[in-house]
């Protein structure tokens, strides 16, 4: 999520090494992750609530986290627990959900000073009439760049006006989720999907932040459409057969991310995972344990951006809560699994 001059070489090397051997995709789509995780949580005595946004973290008289207050209809419901784990991100957890007296703790202020917001994201989701074979789609992630000097083209883009930026997008990530899913054709015959991601500054859309979603006005919709049109012209060069086969297309700005996933400034990878974030002091300071007893952090902000980064954050957090090295447990599980597989 950062330009090369701000990226950690070691972290990027690990990422490249991973993708050299290919990538994984869940059969049935990303929703299968939640579908199979929720029963495990419930079997252990927990529960998963939908449409219940957390409004604040509750503290007891000693300043210890003891629960959360969630929205239910027009009212609030308090849910109490001995351990509170936040995947809402550092800024949301500390600045939105904690009361002022906890937010002012020196340890929390130190963490906030070390963190900066990641860049906002712009997404395009496309529904297509036609199968993977008909449209020439591939189960491949494409990164499309407008030039070789990634620092220069991205810095120029992010420094430009929103009108200029919308017509000169230097970086696109293009993927075809339906082509990756071996169950897709059975479930949705003759249909396909594309997802495209790029970066966009929150400031370009900030003037509409207080407007209701889907009712932000013609100027907002026109700016969003210009971004989408520019993006799709590049995608048509990659997949020319799709141009007259689009049944659905939707663009999402940083404000879309802010509304649906509560990212403070429309970021998709949490805080900025630049070199400063990966310095020893920052890594030692931003930990799963917080200055508020019984409150823990997990997810991308604790480790790295992306699904695997968030998963690492969960392992780190789980280890802290249980006071047990879950990485050792995973290593032992891998050995047992390999031993079982070798006997088949």
Task: Outline where the language-model segments fall.
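Active-site-proximal substrate-binding core of FAD-dependent oxidoreductases
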Residues: 59, 63, 323-344
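C-terminal segments that line or cap access tunnels to active or ligand-binding sites in enzymes
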Residues: 129-252
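A conserved FAD-binding loop/helix module that cradles the flavin
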Residues: 300-322
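Beta-rich nucleic-acid/ligand-interaction surfaces
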Residues: 47, 52-66, 70, 251-264
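Mid-domain catalytic core of redox enzymes
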Residues: 25, 55-187
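Hydrophobic, well-ordered secondary-structure elements that form the walls
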Residues: 85, 126, 196, 235, ...
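A glycine-rich dinucleotide-binding beta-alpha-beta segment and adjacent secondary-structure elements
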Residues: 1-4, 169-175, 237-304
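Active-site/ligand-binding neighborhood in enzyme catalytic cores
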Residues: 1-44, 51, 259-277
């Amino acid at each position: 999520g950062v330009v090369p001059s701000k990226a950690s070489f070691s972290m990027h090397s690990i990422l490249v090494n991973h993708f050299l051997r290919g990538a994984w995709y869940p059969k049935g789509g990303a929703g299968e992750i939640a579908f199979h995780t929720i029963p495990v949580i419930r079997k252990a005595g927990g529960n998963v609530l939908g449409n219940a946004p957390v409004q604040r973290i509750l503290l007891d008289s000693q300043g210890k986290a003891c629960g959360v207050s969630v929205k239910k209809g027009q009212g609030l419901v308090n849910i109490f627990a001995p351990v509170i784990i936040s995947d809402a991100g550092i800024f949301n957890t500390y600045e939105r959900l904690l009361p002022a007296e906890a937010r002012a703790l020196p340890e929390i202020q130190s963490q906030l000073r070390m963190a900066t917001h990641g860049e906002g994201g712009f997404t395009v989701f496309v529904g297509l009439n036609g199968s993977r074979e008909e449209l020439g789609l591939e189960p491949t992630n494409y990164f499309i760049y407008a030039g070789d000097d990634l620092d220069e083209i991205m810095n120029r883009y992010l420094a430009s006006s929103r009108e200029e930026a919308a017509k000169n997008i230097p970086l696109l990530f293009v993927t075809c989720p339906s082509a990756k899913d071996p169950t897709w054709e059975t479930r949705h015959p003759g249909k396909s999907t594309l997802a495209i991601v790029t970066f966009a500054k929150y400031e370009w859309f900030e003037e509409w932040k207080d407007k209701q979603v889907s009712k932000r006005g013609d100027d907002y919709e026109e700016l969003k459409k210009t971004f989408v049109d520019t993006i799709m012209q590049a995608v048509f060069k990659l997949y020319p057969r799709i141009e007259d086969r689009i049944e659905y297309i939707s663009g999402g700005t940083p404000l879309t991310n802010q509304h649906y996933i509560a990212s403070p400034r429309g970021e998709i990878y949490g805080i900025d995972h630049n070199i400063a974030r990966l310095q020893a002091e920052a890594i030692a300071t931003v930990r799963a344990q917080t200055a508020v007893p019984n409150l823990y952090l997990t997810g991308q902000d604790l480790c790295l951006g992306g699904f695997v980064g968030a998963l690492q954050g969960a392992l780190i957090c789980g280890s802290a809560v249980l006071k047990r090295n879950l990485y050792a447990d995973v290593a032992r599980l891998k050995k047992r699994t390999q031993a079982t597989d070798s006997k088949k």
